[in-house]
């Protein structure tokens, strides 16, 4: 059966903060200039916030005394940006939920969500045979939107590198400190004023970047602390300031969604049962000053690796004891250290079993210096 995930209605993106000065009756700005809402008495205000009328945004509200706010132009622009951002988040959540349902019910056919460009399918790569443990891969889950995925590679065992298309163009769109210049204003025939046009009307043409016909916004002016006598950046009007703040809020939410999508993509890249917690390493007792025996069987590898690979890597790990200063009596080693130096154990025991000995028999007339670790 097919999975149909219905979008969840959310009215948070329609919520606006009410101007506190307006509630006290001391706000000197008009409804079109203030960046906060000035609701009439018919609107319901809860905890200093008011909900905007969705029908008013569409231009179809016919209520005489609407209990929702009919926002002015600059606040309507901010709400439209929030609405598009909320729609993207809903579709992203629906896609990730459908992906998780596919893992829970393997026989369920999964239909990709439209309007999203998806990354390429994960294919084979010859680099896996040389480095099967860790391979860099950019999370490219088929149903997760590529606009919210980070470009930083994620280390996933046994995964080939996958590139996400369109990430460079997305980074340019996420610039929140630039505004497009009104082309009609540049021609001198823009009928809208500076406070009504949704594009920038810079007073100085030197501010305009000719490569993309944009101007850089003075962020200090938006924060109310620009003290330059002649600023080289653009000082936007109130409605464009609201647009920039909404774009910054959208970029922050997109970054949070990107982290969540990357984490979900990393988890879903592993097959079920491949990730297990590492067991605690067994503590080996020390005796007579010797260090612990290093046993390769204590090492823990992931169950996804084959046993042949384990044997190849474990073959190069030496086993046995590491000696330091004082040898143990239980160690099967043919070396003993006396006050005269290092001598052959079999020579000391007067046992001759082979013609050539690798150790020099020390006589009483030769004194060798004792080496320390």
Swiss-Prot record:
A zinc finger (C3H1-type) spans 13-41, 47-73, 176-204, 212-238. GO terms for molecular function: RNA binding; sequence-specific double-stranded DNA binding; zinc ion binding. Pfam families: zf-CCCH, zf-CCCH_10. GO terms for cellular component: cytoplasm; nucleoplasm. GO terms for biological process: mRNA processing; regulation of RNA splicing; RNA splicing. It is found in: Nucleus; Cytoplasm. The keyword Iron does not apply. The keyword Oxidoreductase does not apply. Keywords: Cytoplasm, Metal-binding, mRNA processing, mRNA splicing, Nucleus, Repeat, RNA-binding, Zinc, Zinc-finger. Expressed in heart, brain, placenta, lung, liver, skeletal muscle, kidney and pancreas. Interacts with ITGA3. Mediates pre-mRNA alternative splicing regulation. Acts either as activator or repressor of splicing on specific pre-mRNA targets. Inhibits cardiac troponin-T (TNNT2) pre-mRNA exon inclusion but induces insulin receptor (IR) pre-mRNA exon inclusion in muscle. Antagonizes the alternative splicing activity pattern of CELF proteins. RNA-binding protein that binds to 5'ACACCC-3' core sequence, termed zipcode, within the 3'UTR of ITGA3. Binds to CUG triplet repeat expansion in myotonic dystrophy muscle cells by sequestering the target RNAs. Belongs to the muscleblind family. This is Muscleblind-like protein 2. It comes from Homo sapiens. The lineage of its organism: Eukaryota, Metazoa, Chordata, Craniata, Vertebrata.
